[in-house]
Each structure stands twice: as structure tokens, then as C-alpha cells.
């Protein structure tokens, strides 16, 4: 079954995995078995050495836990890039427009690893440019939502609405937990404070992140993202 999938289903020529990689029923398959399978079908296999961060082994489980805890600096260090997603911009309830902070809304698909609910400093890629974003991940308790989503204000973007476009967004740093405000005026004041914090974090990241984290990031992530109808952003 595994051989058929690798050879005919995926047409795999090269496979890379971690030293402790296990797969199959009851995790019976290991790197030695996979190596023999690749050799038997003319493929190549590369075992990636274990990587440590802060004295502990980096693993998918550890990265997911850090995402769920909102530890984005650690996530960036372990992934070698910021955690992000690329989803379509959908219509919301337009509260942001009402209070002068228009936002883009992006829904999370089923089984997506949800970050800790709250506000983040983010990077948003639009038409080859990188913008500072103030992103709320959660259910918007002040105005109410029946599902978790990403809602981002892009203070410096003045290019009109982005509905229907598929945009890349990266979460750089956690700012605060999600909370309910007594009214929209209080929410507006808080968003202004969050924007100042997010901008400081965004500028620090752009300046300090090593080149391998975001080489030509605006070109690599912000261009050639498709719309739903197949045209390019």
C-alpha cells in the first residue's frame, strides 16, 4: 500500500523526514523501512538531523503547541519563518468601517491549528508590498461571532476593498488576549493602542529578522496569489 502510494499516487522521487519519523498502522514504519522502500523503487531518501531550540527537540507537536499558546517568536524561530496563512478575504459585519478601522476578515478551514485567541502584530502582503497589520484571532466578543476567524486592520493600506482576494498574512507577535469591551468607543480606543504596539513590533521584526526568515518577503509572499476566479493579485 505504502509503495503504491509513493510510486504511483505521489510519484515521489525524493523523500525527507526526521530521524524519529514513524508512519503506518500502529506507527510500524520507521526510517529504515522507508529507506528500503525508496531504494526498491529508485527513489532517494534524506534523514534530517534532529534540531533543538532552547535545549529541546523541535517537533511538529511542539510547534503546534507554541502556536496554540500564542508564542509566535518561538514559532518563527522553530519554523525558520513566521507562522501564517493564505485565505480569501470575506465580508464581515462592517463594524470596523463604522469606527474608522476597516478590516479584512479571513475564515479558518476545519482542523486548522488555531492560534491563541487575542490580538497580534502581523504582516500582510498586498500587491507586492508588506504592511503592518493589527490582527484579532477569535470570536469578536464585543460584537459577537458564531465562529473563530482572523480580522485584520491594515492602518497604512489605502487601496480600496480587498473582498474576494486571497491574501497572505503572518502573525509576528502576541499583543493581548481577546476581551469584551463595554461599547464600540472603548473598542476603538483599545485598537488605537494596539496599533502603536503592533507597529513597533512589526518594525522591529522587519529590521532584526535574519535574512533567511524573510528574503525578499514582499516578492515571495505578496505577489501572484490567485483570486477565486483564477486571476492574479
Regions found by a protein language model. Give the residues of each.
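Phosphate/ribose-recognition catalytic cores of enzymes acting on nucleotide-derived substrates
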Residues: 92-233
Amino acid at each position: 500500500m505504502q509503495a503504491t502510494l509513493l510510486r504511483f499516487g505521489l510519484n515521489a522521487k525524493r523523500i525527507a523526514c526526521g530521524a524519529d519519523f514513524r508512519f503506518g498502522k500502529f506507527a510500524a514504519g520507521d526510517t529504515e523501512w522507508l529507506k528500503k522502500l525508496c531504494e526498491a523503487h529508485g527513489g532517494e531518501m534524506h534523514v534530517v538531523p534532529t534540531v533543538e531550540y532552547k535545549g529541546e527537540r523541535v517537533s511538529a507537536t511542539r510547534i503546534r503547541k507554541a502556536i496554540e499558546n500564542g508564542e509566535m517568536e518561538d514559532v518563527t524561530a522553530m519554523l525558520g519563518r513566521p507562522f501564517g496563512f493564505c485565505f480569501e478575504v470575506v465580508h464581515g459585519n462592517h463594524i470596523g468601517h463604522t469606527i474608522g478601522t476597516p478590516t479584512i476578515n479571513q475564515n479558518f478551514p476545519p482542523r486548522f491549528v488555531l492560534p491563541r485567541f487575542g490580538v497580534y502584530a502581523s504582516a500582510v502582503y498586498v500587491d507586492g508590498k508588506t504592511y503592518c497589520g493589527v490582527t484579532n484571532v477569535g470570536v469578536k466578543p464585543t460584537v459577537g461571532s458564531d465562529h473563530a476567524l482572523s480580522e485584520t486592520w491594515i492602518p497604512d493600506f489605502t487601496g480600496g476593498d480587498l473582498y474576494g482576494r486571497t491574501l497572505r498574512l503572518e502573525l509576528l507577535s502576541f499583543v493581548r488576549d481577546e476581551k469584551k469591551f463595554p461599547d464600540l468607543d472603548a473598542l476603538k480606543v483599545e485598537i488605537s493602542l494596539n496599533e502603536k504596539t503592533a507597529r513597533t513590533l512589526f518594525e522591529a521584526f522587519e529590521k532584526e529578522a535574519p535574512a533567511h526568515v524573510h528574503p525578499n518577503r514582499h516578492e515571495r509572499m505578496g505577489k501572484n496569489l490567485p483570486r477565486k476566479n483564477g486571476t492574479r493579485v
